[in-house]
Amino acid sequence: MKQNRTFLVAGLLLALAITTSIVLTGSSNSNLSKTNLAKCEKAVKGPLYTDCYVLYFKTEVKEKGFKTALNDFTAYTRKTNDIEGACHLIAHKLGETLWEDYLANVEKIDPTVCSYGVIHGAFIQAAKYLTPTKFSETLVGACDISPDPAICVHGFGHALAEAKVTHTQANDSCQAINSHYKDKDFYIFVPAACSEGYQMGLADHAEYLLDKDLGTMYESCKAFNELMFNGCAKAAVMTYSRYQPNDLARDLKLKEMINFCKANMFENCNRGIGRGLNEAFPPYLVSIKKQAEMMEKYCSQTDEVKQCIDGLLGQRIFATNYGYKEAKLLCEDTTKLKSLCREALGEIPSTSPNKKSSIVTIV
């Protein structure tokens, strides 16, 4: 049986290698240069901007290998102030290309690079190629040695969504992962992290949001048990404003979110609104000043203003390498909410993975 599993995994890895080769095949000469990175830096903020970096580092994986690519990516994000807030998003895509090497070298890699973005991407890709049982057996060890297993487990949720399991099936899978950590000090954070990752993973695909209102998404979250429901529901609120074509559409969605939380109050609902603000007005598209203005406009309309502020600050810090420093600047750019903003920022744990960052080298 063990030998058969070995052959199965080997076959899957070979298939992935062939697929990756087909996608990345190009000139035999190196396509990498500082000129190409400069083009990415000058690209218009948005999908073209992030896709440019994804292509660059995916190509580097093919030409220079996994370790060099990840080291260069890590160093570059530090040097360029987080690639204008898109670090976590790009790291997801990079992790998808590296997953088999990532798992083979996981003990040598700092998963906090871009707020666990690389490991989340690796998990998402692994879910496509491994059976649910093999997936759990293989990847739970990756979180065991992680500095913050709860954030790591969040990536399990993303992967479950990518595997297209139902809410009920996701509940069962998250339950199994929760059981693995039930005796750990940090267990309180694990259940919601898994269910939240799942719901966010669903919303990574624009078509998922096309025919769903917030109430429908909220009801679907009730498939999760009590410990996991809030994580799913918060993520539903958070992602509801994604993929809006203009400010008017975003305004309508955000007001709907605010009214929904007033009518269906559950723990962390207004924190979901704050996190949704960071989704609707992401750091790689708008200035700190613009985010501060949006925080004042929308958080002021909620029933729990400080919780809303905390959600925005927390998401910004999580999604970027330099988010904590920029969150301080955001607080200083507010007028009406400056005191509450400073207070909320001061309560964010000093152990936040990106409060301090250092370049990680794989040896």
Regions found by a protein language model. Give the residues of each.
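Hydrophobic membrane-insertion alpha-helices, especially the h-region
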Residues: 10-22
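N-terminal Sec-pathway targeting helices
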Residues: 1-13
